[in-house]
Amino acid sequence: MNAAIFRFFFYFST
């Protein structure tokens, strides 16, 4: 689940 949150944040941060 950590990877999902990280990717989600990264995707939104981009």
Swiss-Prot record:
Q: Could you tell me the superkingdom of the organism this chain comes from?
A: Bacteria
Q: What does the UniProt keyword field contain?
A: Leader peptide
Query: Which InterPro entries does the annotation name?
Result: PheM
**One biological process term in Gene Ontology:** regulation of DNA-templated transcription
Q: What is this protein called?
A: Phenylalanine--tRNA ligase operon leader peptide
Q: Which organism is it from?
A: Escherichia coli (strain K12)
Gene name linked to the record:
pheM
